[in-house]
Amino acid sequence: MRAVVQRVTSSSVQVDGNIVGSIGRGLNVLIGISKSDTLQDLKYIRDKVINLRIFEDEKDKMNLSILDVKGELLVISQFTLYGDCRKGRRPNFMEAKGGEEAEGLYKEFLSLLKESNIKIETGEFGADMKVEINNDGPVTIILDSSKNF
């Protein structure tokens, strides 16, 4: 599982011109699910997202998590995080889990996040979405449950 985590002052997502998710201060989280992902991968990424200390404390040091600042999460599925561009010029998405299986894991990931009592908004799985991200910093962290980076 991969996640691109961006610290934001606000973020929103639209489907067919309608806002389906919107947050204030918090994290915009793009989620990619691979063919080999299991519940263990979901829990690993969940724990990283909610405990990453990427918000500044009173000394301007990145020392606070989303839990500490009582921030919000906007979670959006994005299979293109598994685009492999090592060969040729067109991304290969062979490692991305597709369809109902991926949607099931995405929903399970959201359920795990909800256990932390953070306000969570989402995009619409599989939809063509327009995402507005107002980066704070900017601070962008890339997570990978297989620990490739």
UniProtKB/Swiss-Prot annotation:
Subcellular location: Cytoplasm
Residue ranges of the motif Gly-cisPro motif, important for rejection of L-amino acids: 137-138
Catalytic activity: glycyl-tRNA(Ala) + H2O = tRNA(Ala) + glycine + H(+); a D-aminoacyl-tRNA + H2O = a tRNA + a D-alpha-amino acid + H(+)
First-tier enzyme category under EC: hydrolase
Alphabetic keyword roster: Cytoplasm, Hydrolase, RNA-binding, tRNA-binding
Superkingdom, natural source: Bacteria
tRNA-binding among keywords: yes
Disulfide bonds: none
EC annotation from Swiss-Prot or TrEMBL: 3.1.1.96
GO cellular component, one term: cytoplasm
InterPro entries, sorted: Daa-tRNA_deacyls_DTD, DTD-like_sf
One Gene Ontology term from the biological process aspect of the record: D-amino acid catabolic process
A GO MF label: tRNA binding
Coiled-coil regions, chain positions: none
Pfam families, per the entry: Tyr_Deacylase
Family, as annotated: Belongs to the DTD family.
Domain notes: A Gly-cisPro motif from one monomer fits into the active site of the other monomer to allow specific chiral rejection of L-amino acids.
NCBIfam families in the record: D-aminoacyl-tRNA deacylase
Listed PANTHER family: D-AMINOACYL-TRNA DEACYLASE 1, D-TYROSYL-TRNA TYR DEACYLASE
Purpose: An aminoacyl-tRNA editing enzyme that deacylates mischarged D-aminoacyl-tRNAs. Also deacylates mischarged glycyl-tRNA(Ala), protecting cells against glycine mischarging by AlaRS. Acts via tRNA-based rather than protein-based catalysis; rejects L-amino acids rather than detecting D-amino acids in the active site. By recycling D-aminoacyl-tRNA to D-amino acids and free tRNA molecules, this enzyme counteracts the toxicity associated with the formation of D-aminoacyl-tRNA entities in vivo and helps enforce protein L-homochirality.
Subunit and partners: Homodimer.
Protein known as: D-aminoacyl-tRNA deacylase
Source organism (scientific name): Clostridium botulinum (strain Eklund 17B / Type B)
Lineage of source species: Bacteria, Bacillati, Bacillota, Clostridia, Eubacteriales
Gene name of the record: dtd
